[in-house]
Amino acid sequence: MKAVKAPVEEMDQAECEVKEEKSASGPCFPPTFSVSEIKNKQRRHTMFLKLKEEKRKKRMELKKKKKKERKALDDKAPPKEVPKTIENQRIYDETTVNPEDEEVAFDEGTDEFSAYFNRLTNPKVLITTSDRPRGRTVRFCDQLATVIPHAYVYYRRGLALKKVIPQCISRGFTYLMVINEDRKVPNGMVLCHLPDGPTAHFKVSSVRLRKEMKRRGKNPTEHSPEVILNNFTTRLGHSIGRLFAALFPHDPQFVGRQVATFHNQRDFIFFRFHRYIFKNEKKVGIQELGPRFTLKLRSLQKGTFDSKFGEYEWVHKRHEMDSSRRKFHL
């Protein structure tokens, strides 16, 4: 009996040691454990915060360690790593425009906007809406007319766009802008360059009118604004940039200190309207005037608007084109 008891006592001691180790180190989870497997909501939330704090501490320790190593090496320290972003990891597009390319210069001299850039025409814009627009869409159109010089707001009254376009051409308009709405909110824009096109269709989102903006400036003056176009690098983006540029007069009136910005980032075009505030000879600030909104290109059509027989240069096909987050078209 004594020979049998010895191994049993050793096993009991081993089990006690294991239990003590477990209690000291906290609960042990299997290697494939996930916080989402905890059914109790309060415990799950507590465990999530605990894991998040542990990750933060490890990250800070690693950061301090790297900082000490860099300080010790001084001039011999390796160069800092550039953070990876979707922009600098972008997949190269073969249609990226080189401004010095002769083919690009020839296309610019013969495309639909050449008359504007050769100063043969002055922009004149007609802004209209879908049928029976609501108050928010009407106010949005009125504010757009204060941003774009020589812009006039007219209401459709049930007329088809195919009948509106010939009337615009006969009255000397160079652009037709149609603001569509859904559930009383502006959600689309059709921008048609006259008389030869092209026609672009955009999705409109994140519309903020002037009254909805904090710390906005006074209403814009009638001075022609400066136009800034950012990150329109491909052939398609170049065409869209020229489409926006031709909305505004050739020579900005810098006395008004107003600037309209179309900033392309990940194929979203952010529009902002600012006024420069000069504090002294060296310092300058900007004051947003509004409105602000975001555009997403849906299609680009050759010629004027024709929903049935129009020839499309580019159409956004979401499931085919958005397979990679690092692929951009503008």
Swiss-Prot record:
Gene3D superfamilies per record: Probable brix-domain ribosomal biogenesis protein
Domain Brix: start-end pairs: 123-306
Disulfide feature: none
Positions of the UniProt region annotated as RNA-binding: 284-301
GO terms for biological process, alphabetical: maturation of 5.8S rRNA; maturation of LSU-rRNA
Signal peptide: none
Keyword check for rRNA-binding: yes
GO cellular component terms given for this protein: nucleolus; preribosome, large subunit precursor
Function text: May be required for ribosome biogenesis.
Protein name, as recorded: Ribosome production factor 1
Organism placement in taxonomy: Eukaryota, Metazoa, Chordata, Craniata, Vertebrata
